[in-house]
């Protein structure tokens, strides 16, 4: 006969399921938490190890569970929960009168008497992975174990353990109790992921709202509030016209037949000030391309004459109305255009005037190509041909030829005369610098001396 574990919480959920199925134990419908399978294991498999009377035997090991203990929603610890956390912290000796003294109460009282291995087993039972228990860390782990037992007793006393049965109530159990006792949290995260799959349904439900918002934004994009000035004339007033600012919304001129506009400015008629927020009912009669806005006054406007300003506007207007140009401005613009045209003609006198300012001449046909016969007229320049191109800068060869012509303009006899004068001057200088007696001018010099 195989021996089953006394503490099946050490096993994982999948291992518990496989053990229960292997021993012909019916599992509850649906996905349950781990503690439900632990209770099934204790009820059906652990009870097969020995008869229920052996469960009350004295032993220092961890407490043995029996079928009777599982069916009763009694807490693991006999102190703290019923009397209160204060008494449990002071002595932890108070117990319920209805509870029977069991080994669990002794363990609660004798936490300090447990060995290191037993203390380690108790901590592992509550889902804690302790380190090595030494003399310095033993007190810390003892406090931790007491705290875990207090939490376990409070949770069990407040909500009893569910009894496992094959009825439909097992499908409603969620096992929210004693979640800290078991370290198998991987399966819980999987369940959360399954619940998160419902988010696309919310997104589908919100799609009509976004479509409505887009439609309203699309309709608002066509709207443009334009401020138009309308002139009001009163019957008894002698002053100038009254200018009232009215806002016209072109959006939905066909959809909304009537609007109510409130003017928020002060207007003066014969010294009388019209208070703010004066209602003006605008009746819009929509037609195919234009709509008529009839403004009707109430209250203070009874003395005014009949007023029906009519404004024509299209269903969708994107451009703001432009101010009419005066005659002076029109004349200035025409003068500027004329001046610009005159300047262009001065810059390009031989260019033909075109609306775009770009002129092009036709290409002359290529003679002799594609088997065409050559003619002598092709090599002669036609007299009627005139080039419209006016070169701005002359080539450098022409400049050099002009310079050479200017140099040749000096007559030749002037050059010869200048050459003779220079030669005589140089000869005289040369003769004056000689000191020998063979001077040809010595006779002339001597005759001048004798005459003196």
Curated annotation (Swiss-Prot):
It is a single-pass type II membrane protein. The modification Phosphoserine is found at residues 59, 66-67, 79, 82, 155, 158, 165, 167, 176, 179, 183, 189, 221, 223, 249, 253, 264, 291, 305-306, 314, 361, 377, 384, 401. The modification Citrulline is found at residue 319. GO terms for molecular function: DNA binding. Residues 48-111, 149-263 are annotated as: Disordered. Residues 137-242 are annotated as: NAKAP95-binding N. The modification N6-acetyllysine is found at residues 206, 388. SUPFAM superfamilies: LEM domain. It comes from the Eukaryota. The modification Omega-N-methylarginine is found at residues 85, 87. Residues 431-452 are lumenal. Residues 5-48 form the LEM-like domain. GO terms for cellular component: chromatin; nuclear envelope; nuclear inner membrane; nucleus. The modification Phosphothreonine is found at residues 74, 153, 159, 163, 210, 311. Keywords: Acetylation, Chromosome, Citrullination, DNA-binding, Isopeptide bond, Membrane, Methylation, Nucleus, Phosphoprotein, Signal-anchor, Transmembrane, Transmembrane helix, Ubl conjugation. One of its GO terms (biological process) is regulation of DNA-templated transcription. Residues 109-153 form the LEM domain. The chain crosses the membrane at residues 410-430. Residues 1-409 are annotated as: Nucleoplasmic. May help direct the assembly of the nuclear lamina and thereby help maintain the structural organization of the nuclear envelope. Possible receptor for attachment of lamin filaments to the inner nuclear membrane. May be involved in the control of initiation of DNA replication through its interaction with NAKAP95. Has two structurally independent, non-interacting domains: LEM-like (also called LAP2-N or LEM-D) and LEM (also called LAP2-C or LEM-B). LEM-like binds DNA while LEM interacts with BANF1. Belongs to the LEM family. Interacts with LMNB1, LMNB2, BANF1, AKAP8L, GMCL and chromosomes. This is Lamina-associated polypeptide 2, isoforms beta/delta/epsilon/gamma. It comes from Mus musculus (Mouse). The lineage of its organism: Eukaryota, Metazoa, Chordata, Craniata, Vertebrata.
